[in-house]
């Protein structure tokens, strides 16, 4: 959601997957792009995604002008833009290693050479699922690449972070767990209560 519009992927047999938007009042439904956008990150009036048709560069969509513009030349996947020029992405050319760059300075820095399935950035930490056939794990590092810590062995998905907890789902059992953001380590099964 950006402003008063919800952006979503639409599928039909004629055009396959395309990007649409609709107003929060249910009006103003319109196609935004013929191209499939797998993941994106929002900041202000913009959302950011990697290219999916001709390249893997970083693109910025302006929700005011309805224009998509290439803003950074790389081969990225799952970009997260956390500031005007501050970008994290998985570098496809480095087997999905996590990279940070400042777009205006154009000095990409590899934060970890682990092959990464998914990640989330919160404050000064990055939480990620390390891909490995032998040693997959949920891990964390500072946003400068230091202070590596393995939180849990195995395969996890849906990494979501709040001010005091990190939530994630065991891929096999579908059990949701959480751990503290202030002292991550001990995993606790999450059992949501029933609203009364």
Regions found by a protein language model. Name each.
Residues 133-137, 142-196:
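Hydrophilic extracytoplasmic domains
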């Amino acid at each position: 959601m950006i402003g008063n519009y919800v952006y979503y992927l639409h599928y039909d047999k004629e055009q396959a997957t395309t990007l649409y938007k609709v107003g929060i009042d249910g009006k103003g439904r319109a196609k935004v792009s013929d191209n499939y956008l797998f993941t994106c990150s929002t900041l202000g009036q913009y959302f950011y995604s990697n290219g999916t048709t001709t390249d893997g560069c970083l693109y910025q969509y302006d929700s005011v002008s309805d224009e998509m513009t290439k803003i950074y030349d790389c081969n990225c996947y799952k970009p997260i833009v956390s500031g005007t020029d501050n970008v994290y992405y998985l570098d496809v050319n480095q087997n999905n290693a996590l990279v940070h760059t400042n777009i205006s300075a154009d000095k990409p820095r590899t934060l970890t050479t682990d092959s990464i399935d998914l990640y989330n950035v919160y404050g000064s930490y990055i939480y990620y699922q390390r891909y490995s056939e032998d040693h997959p794990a949920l891990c964390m590092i500072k946003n400068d690449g230091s202070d590596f810590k393995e939180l849990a062995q195995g395969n996890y998905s849906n990494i979501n972070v709040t001010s005091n907890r990190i939530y994630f789902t065991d891929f096999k059992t579908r059990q949701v767990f959480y751990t503290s953001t202030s002292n991550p380590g001990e995993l606790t099964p999450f059992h949501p209560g029933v609203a009364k």
